Amino acid sequence: ICIKVETHNHPSAIEPYGGAATGLGGVIRDVLGTGLGAKPIANLDVFCVGNPDTPAADLPPGVIPPQRLLAGVVAGVRDYGNRMGIPTIAGAVAFHPGYLCNPLVFCGTVGIMPRNSANAEVKAGDLVVVAGGRTGRDGIHGATFSSIELTSDSEAQSGGSVQIGHAINEKVLVEFILEASRQRLFRAITDCGAGGLSSAVGEMGAILGATVDLDRVPLKYEGLSATEVWISEAQERMVLAVAPGDWEKLARVAADEGVEATAIGTFTGDGRIDLKWQGRVAGSLDCHFLHEGRPRQRLPSRYVPLPATAPVWSREAASLGATLLDILAAPDVASKEWIIRQYDHEVQGCSVVKPLLGPGEGPADATVVRGVLGRDRGIALGVGLRHRIGPLDPWQMAAGGIVEAVANVVATGADPDRIALLDNFCWGDTRRPESLGTLVEACRACHDVAVDLGSPFVSGKDSLNNVFAWTDAAGKPRELSIPPTLLATAMGQVDDVRRVVTPDLKRPGNRLAVIGLTRDDLAGSQLEALGVVTGGQVPRIDAPSCRETFRRLARAIRDGGIIACHDISDGGLLAAVAEMAIGGGIGATIDLGKVPALLGGAQGRHADLTIAFTETPCRFVCEVAPESATRMGEWLDGIPWAWVGEVVTAPELSITGCFGAEESVKLDRLARAWRSRKTSS
């Protein structure tokens, strides 16, 4: 199994549809170019955009309104993924004012290959073969453009740097590569991504070197210079190392599949990259100099932790029910059904747990696909994003995202001891010591948490300089940077997909338990975003304790004791229970006074609000049948947990406060609030 998640932020900021489409196409080729070619079996996407309600008057010049941008990137992923015949099955959408000018567009792909196809080796004398689309001027300097700050003039100046995608061409290319791999007709493969042929051939020939005749590269049209041919980022192209004796067979397979394949050079063994163009030498570089010759940069970094503050309750607290409705309607929490329904989840026939679940179509924590059709072993995919606390504590932001991603897949039934992680760092201007300091803290968190959880990072990507500069109406220079952001992706193994667990409530009479200790971690919460509270503790991660919680929960799921499970994240406990009730189409009771909690100074109504909506990580709500209830103490021995309610027939959520106050909210009101935001245009 292999997995990769890429970013395509700058291109999507100026051309949302094309930027997102080629972002997905590129990451599919990354997986296709792993080993001797992996079959893409699932896609994921995560979008971070500005507040969808931002008035047009507040947009800097050259910035696309968030609603229109989001619709564009969704359409790009939809059209490319659906036409490729790959299910887009997992993802998330996050909103923050800091993403107004610099949206973040993450695209990921999971692939599968035979074990004996995992290793590739280029040999001297192998042919350099380019297969797939033709080369044009589209995408030239795309990598350079993606590494600089955006401005009001970026669309006019760099529009040509956005690549042009063609999903059907890539679909045909995938079929050709998989068939050629099955017949062992090439020794190594990589995709033409950033830098085009220059990076693809340069990476494959990093030790051996290569000679390339640029005149042989198939072109879309005449008039390109040698430089343009060499660095074009035209899409749907792969570079293969082919033994001379296999070239004719490979060419026949390409012709049968309708793919153009051309031998453009040879891997030489002399340790140099030599380019020929129109009968002369167009370039010659020593490979060691090319890859190792640049001096290593040393940049200053500085990080000054922000002091913790006591929570300040900034307005009269509304009822728990009214606050819950507001949170369910908040952009980060509200249903993303309008996006999800545009994607094909069923193609290839391996989808098991899908993004919407239960009779009421509530949200999933993670999604699960079979690795091979007809077999019961599965792959669970989950993502974690704690963007709201990035400016407050980058270590906790990164750690929290990792723990959330792992919690999502464990809640679905993945083995916590067999989880692989990916990191995607998106930052502002790291030439500034303060910004680089926060990046260093986030990197430390990735190391620390991965070690404590026993989960390795197998891939990653960074996207820096996510800064937008403009001049306002008064002639004053302005700048907006994104908040420090780490997207964590977790991929876990599920031994038997028939035993997976989903969040939707199943049966009246079953009991509800909360696993994990609740603390007053209100900073960066949805409650704070609503303006109910300001400040408080940032959610804190104790990774060794989380690992023990994950293992205990996994054992209970494996033994069949857990019928439904939902991790507690955005919106806190009541939002999680409400989503479970919406999915199941049945009601629940919850007693906040029974929740295991360690609160600082919250009292009275503030204690209710804290327990209901704090976003302390590594907590779960579980539905347990009465016949399994007696074993919960055995399964969860040594970790905080408690019975807090039950599943009921009445279509409502009944809430009892810490001091006995009772209120209820009808299920249809919860569902309407959750589905109230349709940001589709």
Please state what every model-predicted region is.
Residues I1-S681:
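Glycine/proline-enriched, intrinsically flexible loops and inter-domain linkers
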